[in-house]
Amino acid sequence: MFDAKNFLANVTHQPGVYRMFDEKGQVIYVGKAKDLKKRLSSYFRTNLNSKKTSALVSHIHSIETTITASETEALLLEHNYIKAFQPRYNVLLRDDKSYPYILLTKERHPRITSHRGSKKVQGEYFGPYPHAGAVRETLSLLQKLFPIRQCENSVYNNRSRPCLQYQIGRCSGPCIDGLVSDEEYQQQVDFARLFLQGKDQQVLEHLIKKMEQASMQLNFEQAAYFRDQIQAIRAVIEKQFVSNERLDDMDILAIAYQLGIACVQVLFIRQGKVLGNRSYFPKVPANTDLSELTETFVGQFYLQGHQGRIIPSTIIVDHVLNEKHELEVLLTEQAGRKVNIQDNVKGNKSKFLHLAQMNAQAALVTQLKQANLIQERYQALQELLSLTTIKRMECFDISHTMGEQTIASCVVFDTEGPLKSDYRRFNISGITAGDDYAAMEQALLKRYDRPLENEKIPDIIFIDGGKGQLNRALQVFAQLNVSWDKNKPILIGVAKGVDRKAGLETLIISKQNKEVNLLPDSLALHLIQHIRDESHYHAIGGHRKKRQQAFTQSGLEAIEGVGAKRRQALLKYLGGMQGVKNATLAEISSVPGISAALAERIYETLRSE
């Protein structure tokens, strides 16, 4: 039992972070305090008024502290520890992904495109948008309003005639000399920039002036073009929910909680417009106060900077935060400008908060229905396999085209469904083309022939395939020389039916040494189909990406003496890679910058492929 009295006697009154461990040495809770001794002493009072705290204290085996220079530093360190250790008594934000942005590049003829990840590309970033669909929708709209190129530079630099986008009026064709002047193109770029900044009226004023000037100069064709552009923009503005009140960029957070599941709804407002919303379902320990949940979510959401997330000027929440000031100080420091957290709002801000609350409640209802269905499916699978619990399942699939660009996928489900942060893909190499057995063996070795923490050992491993695939998997596990319990997982082959129809699968269960055909309406089968299909799509996605990379590589990169400029010249003068491959030696020699010796090397290399 933990000796609290002896431990507290040596704890400092300085600010810092504490980590609580259970008897297995696992971190079960991370907290911060401006006075470590005072805060830690509060856990060991005789009259604890929180069930959550009582449960936590009963599992404490040891405590470690880290002294910090300030409360602000303690707050940041706390969230770093939560991210690193994922303690079960802390609120945890699951599977957060980086947000997509719209990027306007900094080039002679800027292109407009979507971007996710670190902001290494020079240009202006607009967003964040809640999901990729919102970015695609906005890009499609921009293409209709402003004829700016969206093509990759590799395409733009090698055009010899305008593409289809030019033909249908969605690009002004800056890739071809004479179609649009630099000034005219830049003007459309400026309009798009203003539009993305929410300055729609400025765009309209400029366009109206342009239309009037063109009309006065009797250039009626250009005047009609500007008129159509004005009408299109007005039609878009009428559909958008725009506040008349001048609003800074802000995020609005609302929480709905029921039956142990919490939904945090984040509503993104930029220049008074709703960019979109996104629902989060963090892991919440039982009996967690909603103010604590809000506080922890704000810290994790904005202070874990790997997502490339921009901190807005204003964050509106629907619960009072005990550490509002400390969070504001830290967020201001991170953002490099003043950040306000507001919990008592009026006017349009109140309307936006109400909108977020309605969305949170609606998303929670949907999630509860889904969670109940998942639990029913897990229960059915447990009964089928005579298991008391299933905490983790993994499923493998192989994807290739005629044995080329082989990819293996591993997807992971926990008790809440897909655990996408643990998904993995494996490049398969050094095997006979099309040998799925060898591919599966290589994937399993890459996954399991290494140390595993107890919670990472799956209860079930599904192999998408019949007896042959399953037998190869069993051979791999028999040969594993690892410290973890390799006999724990049940290996199950999922063989497709005669007509490869869903619902006709045969399950080959290794430990029970039997084959099972479940009814099409079986909840256990539905769960197996879900994880199998998820693995299949994950494998296909990786394979397609790898195949596309192989397809788009020109084949010129590996030829000595062919750098970027010569490669560009070859593609431009000979009409793309197919033209280069079909060109005669004389045609290759005629390309500027290509000597006779280099032309011969290119010709021979491409012929030998």
From Swiss-Prot:
Record's GO cellular component terms: cytoplasm; excinuclease repair complex
Coiled-coil residue windows: none
Any one biological process term the GO annotation gives: nucleotide-excision repair
Domain UVR positions: 201-236
Record has DNA damage as a keyword: yes
UniProt subcellular location: Cytoplasm
Domain GIY-YIG span(s) in chain numbering: 13-91
PANTHER family hit by this protein: UVRABC SYSTEM PROTEIN C (PTHR30562:SF1), UVRC/OXIDOREDUCTASE (PTHR30562)
Quaternary structure and interacting proteins, as annotated: Interacts with UvrB in an incision complex.
Family: Belongs to the UvrC family.
Record protein name field: UvrABC system protein C
Biological source species: Histophilus somni (strain 129Pt) (Haemophilus somnus)
Organism classification: Bacteria, Pseudomonadati, Pseudomonadota, Gammaproteobacteria, Pasteurellales
